[in-house]
Each structure stands twice: as structure tokens, then as C-alpha cells.
Design a protein with these regions (language model features):
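A contiguous, low-structure linker/loop signature
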Residues: 1-8
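Short, hinge-like loop/turn segments at secondary-structure boundaries
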Residues: 2, 71-75, 123-126
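Structured adenosyl-cofactor binding patch, chiefly the S-adenosyl-L-methionine
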Residues: 7, 45-49, 60-80, 140-173
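Glycine-/acidic-rich phosphate or pyrophosphate-binding loops and their flanking alpha/beta elements
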Residues: 9-22, 117-123
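RNA substrate-binding interface of SAM-dependent RNA methyltransferases
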Residues: 14-113
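Acidic-residue sensor for enzyme active/binding pockets
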Residues: 31, 134, 173
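Active-site/ligand-binding-proximal alpha/beta "capping" segment
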Residues: 106-158
Length: 173
């Protein structure tokens, strides 16, 4: 119930990953982002920055949950998304489909030894940006599946950003 309105609908089938990858140039890949507000914000940022699709790995919250839809300003209903197959330590195998479709897989990390994000993105045609849960970030399984580990430069004394904020910055770059 929202402002006196109730709606019920059947979920449309998710698009096939292969179909998404045929035309996409930029995709977001989310691992363990379990907060519905962060999911909604990431979809809103992705839509605003021209990301073509969002791929959901293990532990990602349901983008069609009421709070996610609301925070996204409805963009979860417009932006294609698909769940990657597999469990907590096996979903990363689905990333091979992105590599096979000529995507460069970039993982966001606060690690000071990672490449500067702008440098990592320079000259790339097709990008899959992986972001992980707030706090733990991406698992080592996910990090190993990527081509480049990239960081967002931050002021001294700041060690991390909210996952939706970090995603927005990476989509803008």
C-alpha cells in the first residue's frame, strides 16, 4: 500500500544474458549488494549515466522490491537486468560470458595498489563494472575473475564510499 494505491502484477521474464550482451557496451555487475535502497540508487545512477544493463550476482537484493523500485524512481522497470547463475562461490563463472562478449571486467576496490579508475577505463570499448557489498566489498572469487582492479581516488583519511555512490562515480567515468 502506497498513498492509498495497491498494485499486483506478474513479473515479466528476465531478459536472456546473451541477448543483453549483444547490444550492451556498459554493464554493472553487483555482488552481495543486499540493501534495497542501495539497489534502487544504483539502478537510478546506472540509468542516468547510460549503463545498458545491471547484472545481479550472489546475494543481491531484489530490484523489484517496493523500496528498490521507489528509490530507483522506477528505473528498475526500464533498465534491463538479469541474475547471474550460481551460488556464493560459483556465480563468478557466469562472468565468462562477458569476457566471451569482449567486455573488460573491472572490479572496484579501495585497495591503494589498484589502478586509478580513469586509467583503467581509458580506451575501452565494452566495460563490465563490478561492485560489491558495502563493508566487505567484492569477494576474492569475484576479484580473481576480473581483468583490472580499479580504485576511486579519495582524500587522505577516507577509506571508502557508499556502494551506490562508488557505483555512480564509476558509471560517470
Amino acid at each position: 500500500m502506497h498513498r492509498g494505491l495497491v498494485a499486483a502484477a506478474d513479473r515479466a521474464p528476465e531478459p536472456d544474458l546473451g541477448e543483453i550482451l549483444k547490444t550492451a557496451k556498459t554493464v554493472a555487475v553487483l555482488e552481495g549488494v543486499g540493501d534495497h535502497e542501495n539497489i534502487g540508487a544504483i539502478f537510478r545512477h546506472a540509468a542516468g549515466m547510460g549503463v545498458d544493463a545491471v547484472l545481479l550476482g550472489s546475494g543481491a537484493a531484489d530490484p523489484l522490491y517496493r523500496r528498490s523500485v521507489r528509490v530507483s524512481m522506477g528505473h528498475v522497470l526500464r533498465l534491463p537486468f538479469a541474475h547471474l547463475e550460481g551460488g556464493f562461490t560459483t556465480w563468478q563463472r557466469s562472468l565468462q560470458a562477458l569476457a566471451d562478449a569482449s567486455f573488460t571486467l573491472i572490479s572496484l576496490t579501495p585497495n591503494p595498489h589498484a589502478v586509478h579508475l580513469a586509467e583503467a577505463l581509458h580506451g575501452l570499448d565494452k566495460v563490465a563494472m563490478l561492485v560489491g557489498a558495502e563493508g566487505p566489498g567484492l569477494t576474492e572469487h569475484a576479484m580473481k575473475a576480473t581483468d583490472v582492479r580499479a580504485r576511486i581516488p579519495m582524500a587522505p583519511g577516507t577509506d571508502s564510499l557508499n556502494v551506490a555512490t562508488a557505483a555512480a562515480i564509476s558509471f560517470y567515468e
